[in-house]
Amino acid sequence: MAEKIQFELVSPAKLLVSSKVDMVVVPGAEGDFGALALHAPMITTVRPGVIDIHDGGKVSSSVFVAGGFAEVNEERITVLAEEAIPVGELTAEMAEARKKAAKEALDDAKSDRDKAHAGRLMLVAEAMAAAVA
């Protein structure tokens, strides 16, 4: 049997996942990456998207994250997510409401900082819409 890696997914609200799994596929800043046992150590940012948790030769669960950071070493991957929602709990209405709020924030933005924040909200909304599609 192949070695497993300890996966922990933490949001500001709570610890969502803490279990040994075969592999975790994370939406990294430079593209998706898979983390297995004995992975080379790294720290990276996580872009809005879906984390797929593989166990038993298949995707056992998927979680939408709004971004964050990931730390990987030979034994563990820890994702600190800004927000995390199991994909099964997402709805098209949630994604549409986020898009509407992001568009309103972009329309109301006056400063470059406000525009950047609204752009980030739109990225999260679009990633959420893709996750439920």
From Swiss-Prot:
Protein name, UniProt field: ATP synthase epsilon chain
Keyword terms: ATP synthesis, Cell inner membrane, Cell membrane, CF(1), Hydrogen ion transport, Ion transport, Membrane, Transport
PANTHER family, per database record: ATP SYNTHASE DELTA/EPSILON CHAIN, ATP SYNTHASE EPSILON CHAIN, CHLOROPLASTIC
GO cellular component: plasma membrane; proton-transporting ATP synthase complex
NCBIfam families registered for this protein in UniProt: ATP_synt_epsi (TIGR01216), PRK00571.2-4 (NF001851)
Membrane topology summary: Peripheral membrane protein
Subcellular location: Cell inner membrane
Subunit structure of this chain's protein: F-type ATPases have 2 components, CF(1) - the catalytic core - and CF(0) - the membrane proton channel. CF(1) has five subunits: alpha(3), beta(3), gamma(1), delta(1), epsilon(1). CF(0) has three main subunits: a, b and c.
Main location group: membrane
Classification via Gene3D superfamilies: F0F1 ATP synthase delta/epsilon subunit, N-terminal
Function: Produces ATP from ADP in the presence of a proton gradient across the membrane.
Family: Belongs to the ATPase epsilon chain family.
Any GO MF annotation of the entry: ATP binding
Native organism: Paramagnetospirillum magneticum (strain ATCC 700264 / AMB-1)
